[in-house]
Amino acid sequence: MKRHLFLYLFVLASLACHAPKDQAYQDKSGFVQVHKVIPSIAYDIRYYGNDNFLGVRVDGYKAPTAYLTKEAAEALKKVQDELNEEGLGLLVFDGYRPQKAVDHFVRWSKAVSDTLTKAKYYPEIDKAKVFELGFVATKSSHTRGSTVDLTIINLETKKELDMGSGFDFFGAISIHDFP
């Protein structure tokens, strides 16, 4: 089962490599709402609410939904279908991310006195280093619409499988080549 989980996550990560590089960041043509391609997908769009590393709704998030390129959503559907056969499914935290959201992340990292979410999201690091350490990027692959943040859930219990850390945890446990 662990082998399958790593395979699924590898396939999803590779979606970003096949994203069209010339697609305009704000142009949504060719984008779809993920749940329209995968009706059984579960959402927990953290940046639409306050349960995220900023502690507030992130700029640019106007609804609790996820957008991806049509190709990425169709590839994700294949993964969802395979997982469903095992009694598992996908829970999407984020897909397309507008640049204004990334800009919000940058502003947050510079407000060093704001440590509201430190205990939950970055207890061991200085928030000013989240970019330097590779937890967040100033030019996110999410802005192309072919990158997705997700986890796997048990369909019966609706509980997330243990991936080592929670969503958006900035620490050694959540990155394989942590400096």
Locate predicted features.
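Bacterial Sec-dependent N-terminal signal peptides
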Residues: 1-26
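Extracytoplasmic cell-surface/polysaccharide-interacting catalytic and binding patches
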Residues: 17-95, 102-179
